[in-house]
UniProtKB/Swiss-Prot annotation:
Name of the gene encoding the protein in the UniProt record: Or5ap2
UniProt entry keywords in alphabetical sequence: Cell membrane, Disulfide bond, G-protein coupled receptor, Glycoprotein, Membrane, Olfaction, Receptor, Sensory transduction, Transducer, Transmembrane, Transmembrane helix
Name of the protein in question: Olfactory receptor 5AP2
Cited Gene3D superfamilies: Rhodopsin 7-helix transmembrane proteins
Keyword Acetylation: no
Length: 317
């Protein structure tokens, strides 16, 4: 998916100081519809994720490792959606669709940081579910408050560190030709396509880091769930198996949607790359997935439902 560069840069060309985000569609009849649709989705994303964080903070019964991770995930979802969606909404209604060079680099960095953090965080959550089901007696020791904090901190450090490398590698390049990004946010492939520098090294580094990070996270998830499956099958009672599976079902669904989209997006061969297809998939994981996660984790979660009812009874009734 990452393309090689343009060869030797033209030193006499004027360096780009801002970019133009072409967006999802140039059809003016669709702009208002898309604005209304994405505004609704973004509002639901903020309400769902910030509401989940507040609920976990308020209700002491949710002060467990599982919900500590979920609260962190909600923060990450709200953050990486907010790094892209507000600018996209503005561009849908504004004639000026420009973004400054530094603004593009900032968006690129924070989106990559939170996206990478989510990748690692979902892997840590899979390990948490494994620890809870494989050995419930040792679970408080294996997932103490200190260990949970270290795992979440490591996820953030890995996500932000990875994004810092990508941002430095991308924005050290020269952009001296067209400044029109065929996307609704600053993403790697369209930026490398615009560069008049040799992007061969960028392609190698980005593919190596992306592949390692995604594959390592996926392996942690797969190994954790394989151990979980073995533990569930060994349980003597059907009720115990059902209860154990129900605690993992929502996370498994979220993991499948997220990593399935990321694997399709970033690890498919260059020959199958299509910018229009890329935009559609990008909408799904930048806008839709952050909205879905609070719904996935709360709809069939008895603890969350109970906490919501308790708060409604205490503060509304």
């Amino acid at each position: 998916m990452v393309r090689s560069g343009k060869g030797i840069q033209n030193k006499n060309a004027t360096e780009v100081t801002e970019f133009i985000l072409l967006g999802l569609s140039d059809n003016p009849d669709l702009q208002g519809v898309l604005f209304a649709l994405f505004l609704i989705i973004y509002t639901m994303t903020l309400v769902g994720n910030l509401g989940m964080m507040a609920l976990i903070k308020i209700d002491r019964s949710l002060h467990t490792p599982m919900y500590f991770f979920l609260s962190s995930l909600s923060f990450v979802d709200a953050s990486y959606s907010s790094s892209v969606t507000p600018k996209m909404l503005v561009n849908l209604m504004a004639e000026d669709k420009s973004i400054s060079f530094n603004g593009c680099a900032t968006q690129f960095f924070f989106f990559g940081s939170f996206l990478g953090t989510e990748c690692f965080l979902l892997a840590m959550m899979a390990y948490d579910r494994y620890a809870a089901i494989w050995n419930p007696l040792l679970y408080p020791v294996l997932m103490s408050g200190r260990i949970c904090f270290m795992l979440v901190s490591t996820s953030f450090l890995a996500g932000f560190g990875n994004a810092a490398i990508h941002t430095g590698m991308t924005f050290r390049l020269s952009f001296c030709g067209s400044n029109k990004i065929n996307h609704f946010y600053c993403d790697t492939p369209p930026l490398l396509k615009l560069s008049c520098s040799d992007t061969h090294i960028n392609g190698i580094v980005i593919m190596a880091f992306s592949s390692f990070n995604v594959i390592s996270c996926v392996l942690i998830v797969l190994i954790s769930y394989l151990c979980i499956l073995i533990a569930i099958l060994k349980m003597p009672s059907a009720e115990g198996r059902h209860k154990a599976f129900s605690t993992c079902a929502s996370h498994l669904m979220a993991v499948t949607i997220f990593f399935g989209t990321i694997l399709f997006m970033y690890l498919r061969p260059t020959s199958s790359y299509s910018m229009e297809q890329d935009k559609v998939v990008s909408v799904f994981y930048t806008v839709v997935i952050p909205m879905l996660n609070p719904l996935i984790y709360s709809l069939k979660n008895k603890d969350v439902k109970k906490a919501v009812k308790k708060i409604l009874h205490n503060y509304v009734v």
